[in-house]
């Protein structure tokens, strides 16, 4: 199989494109050509590194261009320059008691306070994404909006490659204005949780339709309540309960379904004890950071911000076992989904995934690295369709 040639997507610090070889080995990185159209970097961005393009049979991973949002966020991410707390308090007055100047004179909140974080999310969804109501029950994960919407922006770029230009025109990638929008794009969110954040943002930003699945009836009931209180979401998001805790796609994807992409933020801990240690570590890091900046650190036992139910935080075998099950099941539905994707929190889990993707016959594998402040998040994407099938899929969709 000839390695595909394609440019790096915008905003990613590193893009590794891989296409399985004919031999029984792990996927090989494919070559990439230089991007001709790059979004303009913002003033605080680092100098951009040139992409490499060497059409060799065996190529090394290619460094994509470092793009310009101040936090390393995608160029289309609205939150690259921080939060406008004055505007947020105007839309959500309940947030005001939790906002205060930090030692540098900038407005902020205590991110260890679950009430403050939840109200910040509500304000962001109201101000930037046109939602009037959003809430989660106590004890469920409260997702950071900037990082969640970043995942969607990268997926939009991935879909853009399968969207032909209008009237036979030649597309130039990366083309940040060509990300497919509208209800003909259908996505499947695995493990949507009680917050339903990916379907909510995906519809409000790109107009995509979503199927959201979860193993927890309480979570789906809460997402149903969010939909009911935002009339613009009626008929755009459908919910499906996974009745088998050992299955991911099986029992959710139906024979008539066609998904442009699947997405998932998998549970990354292997046990409740491991998840609890992770929460304690985050709280200690926040407290240490506050002391270093001169903030008063209050003693509190509340951990909702780093809370979450079992299905949200951990599963037997942890992230690696979950991803392995997802990859094996995806083979069964390979002709029904254009792209399968998942976040990967631990870099060491990538190699086992590459080997398994080779075994199940994935035609192409992508690894995207997204920088969000000091945090590095990876998106693993794979497809069982050929480039020709991708083109036909995009042509049929648009």
Curated annotation (Swiss-Prot):
Residues 1-12 have a biased composition (Basic residues). Its EC number is 2.1.1.181. InterPro entries: METTL16/RlmF, rRNA_lsu_MeTfrase_F, SAM-dependent_MTases_sf. Keywords: Cytoplasm, Methyltransferase, rRNA processing, S-adenosyl-L-methionine, Transferase. Residues 1-85 are annotated as: Disordered. Transmembrane segments: none annotated. Residues 20-40, 48-59 have a biased composition (Low complexity). It is found in: Cytoplasm. GO terms for molecular function: 23S rRNA (adenine(1618)-N(6))-methyltransferase activity. GO terms for biological process: rRNA base methylation. Its main location: cytoplasm. Specifically methylates the adenine in position 1618 of 23S rRNA. This is Ribosomal RNA large subunit methyltransferase F. It comes from Shewanella loihica (strain ATCC BAA-1088 / PV-4). The gene is rlmF.
């Amino acid at each position: 199989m000839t390695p595909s040639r394609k440019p790096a997507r915008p905003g990613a610090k590193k893009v590794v494109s891989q296409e399985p070889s004919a031999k029984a080995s792990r996927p090989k990185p494919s070559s990439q050509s230089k991007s001709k159209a790059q979004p303009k970097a913002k003033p605080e961005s680092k100098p951009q590194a040139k992409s490499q393009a060497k059409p060799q049979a065996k190529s090394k991973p290619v460094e994509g261009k470092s793009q310009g949002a101040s936090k390393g966020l995608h160029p289309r991410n609205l939150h690259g320059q921080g939060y406008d707390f004055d505007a947020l308090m105007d839309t959500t007055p309940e947030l005001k008691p939790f906002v205060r100047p930090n030692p540098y004179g900038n407005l902020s909140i205590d991110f260890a306070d679950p009430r403050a974080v939840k109200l910040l999310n509500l304000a962001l969804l109201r101000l930037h994404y046109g939602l009037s109501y959003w809430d989660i029950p106590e004890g469920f994960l409260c997702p950071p909006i900037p990082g969640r919407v970043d995942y969607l922006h990268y997926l939009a770029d991935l879909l853009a490659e399968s969207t032909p230009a209008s009237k036979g025109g030649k597309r130039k990638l990366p083309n940040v204005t060509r990300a497919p929008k509208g209800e003909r794009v259908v996505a499947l969110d695995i493990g949507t949780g009680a917050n339903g954040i990916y379907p909510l943002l995906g519809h409000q930003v790109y107009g995509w339709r979503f199927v959201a699945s979860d193993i927890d009836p309480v979570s789906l009931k809460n997402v149903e309540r969010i939909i009911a209180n935002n009339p613009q979401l009626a008929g755009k998001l459908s919910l499906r309960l996974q009745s088998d805790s050992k299955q991911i796609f099986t029992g959710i994807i139906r024979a008539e379904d066609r998904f442009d992409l699947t997405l998932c933020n998998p549970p990354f801990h292997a046990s409740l004890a491991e998840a609890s240690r992770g929460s304690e570590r985050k709280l200690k890091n926040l407290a240490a950071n506050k002391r270093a900046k001169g903030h008063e650190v209050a003693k509190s036992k509340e951990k909702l911000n780093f809370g979450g139910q079992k299905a949200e935080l951990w599963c037997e075998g942890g992230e690696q076992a979950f991803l392995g099950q997802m990859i094996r099941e995806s083979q069964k539905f390979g002709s029904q989904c254009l792209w399968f994707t998942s976040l990967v929190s631990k870099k060491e889990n990538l190699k086992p995934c590459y080997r398994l993707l080779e075994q199940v016959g994935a035609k192409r594998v992508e690894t995207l690295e997204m920088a969000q402040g000091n945090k590095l998040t990876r998106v693993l994407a794979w497809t069982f369709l050929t480039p020709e099938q991708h083109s036909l899929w995009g042509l049929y969709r648009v």
